[in-house]
Amino acid sequence: MPAECVNEVSAAKPSDDNAASNQTQSGAAPAEPAASEEPQQKTSSEKLESKEDDAAAKARQRQERFKALQARAKNAAERNLKETAAETQRLATDPALLSSLSRKHAFASHNLLKADTEAAGEDFERKRAWDWTIDESEKWDRRMEKKQRHRDDVAFQDYTQDARKVYKRQLRQMQPDMAAYEREKLAAIEKAAANGDLEIVETNDGEMIAVDKNGTFYSTADTIGFTENKPDRAGVDKLVADLRKAEEVRLKKRRERRGDEEPDVTYINEKNKQFNQKLARFYNKYTTEIRDSFERGTMI
């Protein structure tokens, strides 16, 4: 029995030695994956850290935007409150009353200053002129003279003066087309330069100027180039509208002179017309609404 055990033990030893040798031979290979797992763990940890940093940065940006929106909302609320208060005060105040009070205050101040100046024995107009320069005083005098001429020019004098007033009014209403002027000017310069009438010269300062060599670029009394001008469609429409407006004014004045201003004929002769006018003077304020209702058909 002991001999068999010894044999079994001795027989088992070689197998253990073989297993150990096999483990030693195969154990070198598993050690390598453990070493390669360390960089993978490092890269995964770096990725996690970068993701956390990105999330933190995005959170900070969202917080900053939220704070900016809060500040804008607060400023908008404050401005709205101020504007609402100003609007309420403006609606509660009568502008006509304010203008009347300011006008009365200016008139009272003027009279008070005039009384004090005359009481001191000084010239009021001379003292008041000290507040203005010579240029301002001359401009004011010219303005007053112009206003006085306009007042005197209102009444009809003769047809020449009437035509002059119409012409000046049309000039005031006319607005120059600077864009079209610049286009035509540029086209004229290019045409003259192509024909050799203009010479482009550079000055010492580097500025480019055009020199008229033949003296034919600018218009003179003998120039007839304006006959080739073709107005645009808008200019033609404006001219037609002005002519129609003048014709309407002329016809309206002729109707007023003839007494044909009434659109509806409600009489059969001149005597009946006078009678209807007399009735209208006394009863129009009572019958206007009734007549309008009959014309609209709402009375029935």
From Swiss-Prot:
Signal peptide: none annotated. Keywords: Coiled coil, mRNA processing, mRNA splicing, Nucleus, Spliceosome. It is found in: Nucleus. Residues 44-67, 75-85 have a biased composition (Basic and acidic residues). It holds the Pfam family SYF2. Residues 28-38 have a biased composition (Low complexity). Residues 1-89 are annotated as: Disordered. Its main location: nucleus. GO terms for cellular component: catalytic step 2 spliceosome; post-mRNA release spliceosomal complex; Prp19 complex. The keyword Electron transport does not apply. Residues 55-94 form a coiled coil. One of its GO terms (biological process) is RNA splicing. Belongs to the SYF2 family. Associated with the spliceosome. Involved in pre-mRNA splicing. This is Pre-mRNA-splicing factor syf2. It comes from Aspergillus fumigatus (strain ATCC MYA-4609 / CBS 101355 / FGSC A1100 / Af293) (Neosartorya fumigata). The gene is syf2.
